[in-house]
A protein has these predicted regions:
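Conserved donor nucleotide-binding strand/loop of the catalytic core
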Residues: 74-75, 89-125, 132
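Short beta-strand-to-loop acidic/aromatic patch adjacent to the donor-nucleotide binding site
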Residues: 125-141
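A conserved acidic beta->alpha catalytic loop
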Residues: 81-89, 104-106, 141
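Cell-envelope/extracellular polymer assembly enzymes that use nucleotide-activated donors
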Residues: 43-46, 76
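Short, acidic, metal-binding catalytic loop of nucleotide-sugar glycosyltransferases
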Residues: 63-74
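N-terminal membrane-anchoring/stem segments of glycan-assembly enzymes
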Residues: 1-41, 94
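Acidic helix N-cap motif at the loop->helix transition within catalytic regions
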Residues: 59, 86-93, 145
Length: 148
């Protein structure tokens, strides 16, 4: 066998090996029906907001959450009023949020506040009440399709 014929044979063999799996998968794909896709289950969200003296912006954020194009009964808004000296808690409650108040001058900061809030939610709501948590700053405003 000449060297060029040997090289041609090796190249043809390599291509045959590389593409031979298609001889199995193409006929199989003709007979297998695709799985029917289910409608996705809507998820329940808990929106967590840590706020400290945010009376001027907290209402606007809660209103933007309530204006979501996602089913309102699947969204619960929680606000932790952390060491506030203004009426942030009252404004948040008036806009429909569940409000917890925290007074701890020793452990100050968003991390402590969110930890406190998560402990309160775990105590007051059964496990599995929410599929996901969304953490927002009090000075945010979200678009109507943010959750979807």
């Amino acid at each position: 066998m000449k060297p060029i014929e040997l090289i041609n044979f090796l190249i043809i063999s390599l291509f045959f090996i590389c593409y031979s799996y298609q001889f199995f998968y193409i006929p199989v794909s003709l007979f297998i029906k695709p799985k029917a896709h289910r409608e996705p289950t809507p998820h329940r969200f808990a929106v967590l907001i840590a706020a400290r003296n945010e009376r001027s912006v907290i209402g606007e954020l809660i209103d933007s959450i309530n204006a979501q194009d996602y089913p309102a009964h699947l969204i619960k808004i929680f606000v932790i009023a952390d060491n506030c000296t203004d009426d942030t808690a009252l404004i948040a409650q008036a806009h429909g949020a569940v409000v917890y108040t925290r007074r701890d001058s020793l452990h100050v900061g968003k991390g402590y506040a969110l930890n406190f809030l998560l402990e309160k939610i775990a105590r007051d709501y059964p496990a599995g009440s929410f599929d996901a948590f969304i953490v927002l700053d009090a000075d945010n405003v979200i678009a109507p399709n943010y959750i979807t």
